[in-house]
């Protein structure tokens, strides 16, 4: 009698779809980070705001999405020399503050997502974790993403996070005897254009 009840319970469990998560065979997808991808770091001084950008991503990097473990794997490696703040003096101070001679690259390692986005035509918000390496210091952050599909083979993934110079042991620059001071807070955004390379 107990065995019969157990068989009935298992049958109902499977027929209602509760078993789908374990029997489904999600396929990993691999995505190329296209050159049109950008990364920006915006901040402010006691006088005005500034924004330093890399307007063309030159790394041949790929990102892997795995629905089975909701993993989001890959690393962006950005040459700090490529940042442009649209002001020669500000650009130089920005790079100097990031110690680009000693640590020439900013690295963003993707770790996980809270859930897999559907990548539909409408923008969808999802959170995840990344590890940022800057000036020789690594920090783990939660990032808010906006994901949408551009066409059959291309998606856009925009990540946003606020952190500070101090998170990486850096001191914000100041000029003119301290009359112009850069605030600690930075708004970081990476806008990734991703092209699927496996079908």
Language model region names:
Residues 19-199:
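Low-complexity, acidic/polar, glycine-enriched regions of mature
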Residues 1-31:
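Bacterial Sec-dependent N-terminal signal peptides
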């Amino acid at each position: 009698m107990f065995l019969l009840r157990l068989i009935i319970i298992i049958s109902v469990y499977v027929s209602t779809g509760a078993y789908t998560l374990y029997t489904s065979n999600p396929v990993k997808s691999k995505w190329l980070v296209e050159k049109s991808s950008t990364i920006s770091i915006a901040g402010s001084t006691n006088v005005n705001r500034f924004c330093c950008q890399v307007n063309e991503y030159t790394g041949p990097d790929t990102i892997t999405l795995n629905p089975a473990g909701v993993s989001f794997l890959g690393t962006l490696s950005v040459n700090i020399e490529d940042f442009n703040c649209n002001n020669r003096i500000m650009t130089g101070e920005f790079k100097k503050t990031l110690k680009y001679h000693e640590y020439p690259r900013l690295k963003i390692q993707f770790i996980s997502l809270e859930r897999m986005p559907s990548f539909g035509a409408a923008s969808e918000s999802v959170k995840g974790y990344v590890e940022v390496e800057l000036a020789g210091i690594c920090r783990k952050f939660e990032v808010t993403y906006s994901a949408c599909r551009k066409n059959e083979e291309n998606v856009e993934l925009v990540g946003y996070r606020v952190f500070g110079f101090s998170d990486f042991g850096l001191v914000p620059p100041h000029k003119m005897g301290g009359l112009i001071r850069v605030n600690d807070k930075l708004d970081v955004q990476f806008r990734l254009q991703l092209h699927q390379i496996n079908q």
